Amino acid sequence: MAEPSAATQSPSVSSSSSGAESSAPGGGSGSPGACPALGTKSCGSSCADSFVSSSSSQPVSLFSTSQVHDLIFWRDVKKTGFVFGTTLIMLLSLAAFSVISVVSYLILALLSVTISFRVYKSVIQAVQKSEEGHPFKAYLDVDITLSSEAFHNYVNAAMVHINRALKLIIRLFLVEDLVDSLKLAVFMWLMTYVGAVFNGITLLILAELLVFSIPIVYEKYKTQIDHYVGIARDQTKSIVEKIQAKLPGIAKKKAE
């Protein structure tokens, strides 16, 4: 008679144990559900640390990568042509005139267009006796205020790049890596010859022409360019390895 009673008690024990397991969902090791077992304080601190680390590793970008990619690859010919033509005219104007003259002429041209259109619409409304109102009212009503959140996002994005640049400058000028510092020295030495031939505006014009032309050429001849770039990279790597092997400090660091 004792066996049936034990048999009747075992389902209750198993159901209670399963109920205890179901009361702690996700209780596996390493799962988020393990937080209740760690306590409220430790769980909150660990969750906060993980949130901070994940958010800090994803900085806000000032520009969308896809938009820049579409712009330099001429996905929208009208938009790219407008940007390319406007910036090229600006740079050519700065090459011929001073910055003050270029800015003044641009403002005068813009004011000439807007004032002429405003006077024209006023005369038309007076002749037709219509009440259309201000011709630029739709644009005047547009909210262009910058929110504090958006401002802080842009500042944070800029600070990421500034801090990265400062670390790189310190690393190069304090010779953390001798080869990288020598590369900078050789590059600056070559730039002295470039600066003797071209001024800053000319270099900007050439840079714009390259930015808006090289991506198209690369997209068209990608296979051939990748082949020759790979050969040049291998040769450069072998030369750098030979130089590093002859430098005692670098060779000792590699051996360690």
Curated annotation (Swiss-Prot):
Record region (Interaction with FADD): 211-256
UniProt-annotated location(s): Endoplasmic reticulum membrane; Golgi apparatus membrane
Topology with respect to the bilayer: Multi-pass membrane protein
Location of N-acetylalanine modifications: A2
Modified residues (Phosphoserine): S31
Keyword Cytoplasm: no
Record field: compositional bias (Low complexity): 1-24
Residue ranges annotated as Cytoplasmic topological domain: 2-87, 112-171, 193-196, 218-256
Position of the signal peptide: none
Domain Reticulon residues, every copy: 68-256
TM ranges: none
BP terms from Gene Ontology: apoptotic process; vesicle-mediated transport
UniProt intramembrane annotation: 88-111, 172-192, 197-217
UniProt-annotated stretches for the region Interaction with BACE1: 224-226
Keywords: Acetylation, Apoptosis, Endoplasmic reticulum, ER-Golgi transport, Golgi apparatus, Membrane, Phosphoprotein, Transmembrane, Transmembrane helix, Transport
GO cellular component: endoplasmic reticulum; endoplasmic reticulum membrane; Golgi apparatus; Golgi membrane
Disordered as annotated region, ranges: 1-32
Subunit composition and interactions: Homodimer. Interacts with RTN4. Interacts with BACE1, BACE2, BCL2 and FADD. Interacts with ATL1 and ATL2. Interacts with TMEM33. Interacts with ZFYVE27 and with KIF5A in a ZFYVE27-dependent manner. Interacts with RIGI. Interacts with TRIM25.
The protein's name in its UniProt record: Reticulon-3
Protein species of origin: Bos taurus
Lineage: Eukaryota, Metazoa, Chordata, Craniata, Vertebrata
Gene that this sequence comes from: RTN3
